[in-house]
Amino acid sequence: LFLQKALGGFKVDNMMFYVLNDFSDDEIESIAEKIQSEKERYISVNKLYVAVSKTNNKLKSLPKTYQIVLRMLRLAVRTDMTPMFYDRLEVKKLILAVDDISLLESIYNENLKKLEVYDRDNGTDYMSFLRLYLKYDGSVQRVAQETFVHRNTINYQLAKIKKILGNNLKTFEERFKIILAFEVRDVL
């Protein structure tokens, strides 16, 4: 049914794209979920990722929308979130709208890359630890409860992370830079 109302579709590598016309947001969500749930009937893949862009009323902005959907699909694969809807991405929508990929890369490189390299070279997982620490608004107690690790160990790991990053993580701005770098990393 939905293919009859589609303006068109095309395939790139192993991805299918449909340009839909005259669908409500609820109909699009229903279609995306139906494709996801019935994929086995039509194609033989282990995992199917569905990304739904924002509603676009201008034909000239289709190329930009296409680029955003490609980045959303990479994010869907990385986070195993499908179907993924642009309108539900919150902060990531802002990052997806940035055309200057080198700007996004520099935000990540300046604020978080050192820690990722350290993890890779030393077999640690400070990236996940830092993300959890930021998720709990810098509460050592909550991180200790969540990870079943003593607070002294948490404080030791934090000191190590702060030294690696050259960031004290005390002020809003210091934490925001790291949170933004994590969000950028998710999208790139």
PLM region spans:
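Cytosolic nucleotide-utilizing catalytic cores of signal-transduction proteins
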Residues: 1-188
